[in-house]
A protein has these predicted regions:
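Predominantly soluble domains enriched in secretory-pathway, periplasmic, or organellar proteins
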Residues: 1-310
Length: 310
């Protein structure tokens, strides 16, 4: 379902059932459209933000036998666009919703096996999809779509044995800090560092476990990382100048998500298995407070409304 919540009254304002299993959402540049990506039946549906009425339905149909693909990595982009990836098809689609009832779709095929998540850079220029089915990532320059998709980090991990993946990692625009991008390495206890001026590997950082979220503090000074089971009681902080771990924290069992205050002075973390939130000072790394909550998962502050791709 797609649910709209009035955050002032803390009540559900409206809800519509729109698919069998949905995975992500995004809001258009002008705030008038809400897009939802679906595993089942596969595709993206666009709704009017004011009424939650269906505006456009974009089935993720691919191949000669017209199968439906799971859709992941949905983000908003400048120019009333939504970008998303097709897990089963190995494609990236760019949907222009300038005329909402008649979306214009541009498809990029053969980007790699099983894109599992994606990010858009804060300036809205680059869309990067991580690949689960093979090493490397797929890069699309949204300012120069005719150049097509470029493969980056193709040789990372060649010939190496991956560990079992216990939790699918996530890519988000907050993994960008200055001219560097920090991304989780699938099936490895590493964070990859990418030079965004050349889109080549700039380093690898050994970490405590398999990274799930790799998030930059708003000023880009450090990177906070959480991990999949069995290491999901731990957070590590990476200095973006030295590329070294400067702090390891153990907030508790089931650290699932992090969210920074808009200026980065604090980071909120969900500690699901201990039914609480833990808030840390990002300079001293001291715990500021805890808040009781029943099985908290994602944490989303309202400043996201002013950020592309979040």
């Amino acid at each position: 379902g797609l649910t709209r919540v009035d955050i002032l009254s803390m009540k559900i304002d409206k809800r519509v059932i729109q698919s069998g299993n949905s995975i992500g959402g995004a809001i258009s540049q002008d705030g008038r459209l809400v897009a939802v990506s679906n595993y089942e039946p596969g595709g993206v549906k666009i709704f009017d933000a004011a009424t939650l009425e269906l505006v456009a339905d974009i089935p993720a149909v691919y191949g000669n036998d017209r199968q439906l693909s799971k859709v992941i990595g949905l983000v908003d982009a400048p120019g009333q666009k939504f970008i998303f990836s097709l897990w089963d098809a190995g494609e990236i689609w760019v949907a222009d919703l300038s005329s909402p009832a008649k979306p214009v779709i541009r498809k990029f095929k053969d980007i790699g096996l099983n894109p599992y998540d994606a990010l858009i850079t804060p300036d809205g220029r680059y869309y990067i999809a991580g690949l689960f089915g093979e090493d490397g990532m797929a890069l699309l320059d949204l300012w120069n779509l005719d150049d097509g998709v470029k493969r980056i980090l193709n040789n990372y991990g060649k010939g190496e044995q991956k560990l079992p993946v216990y939790k699918m990692p996530h890519l988000e625009g907050w993994a960008i800090a200055g001219n560097l991008a920090f991304v989780p390495a699938i099936g490895r206890h590493e964070v990859l560092v990418i030079d965004t001026t050349t889109w080549t590997e700039a380093g690898r950082i050994k970490v405590h476990g398999q990274p799930v979220f790799v998030m930059a503090r708003p000023d880009g000074r450090n990177i906070w990382v959480n991990f999949a089971v069995p290491d999901n009681d731990t957070l590590q902080v990476i200095d973006t100048q030295s590329l070294k771990i400067v702090k390891t924290l153990t907030p508790g069992k089931g650290v699932l998500h992090m969210e920074f205050e808009p200026r980065g002075e604090e980071v909120w973390t969900s500690v699901r298995d201990e039914d609480r939130l833990a808030v840390f000072d990002t300079e001293t790394f001291e715990q500021v407070t805890t808040i009781e909550a029943k099985k908290p998962s994602g944490i989303f502050l309202t400043f996201r409304a002013h950020r592309t791709g979040l």
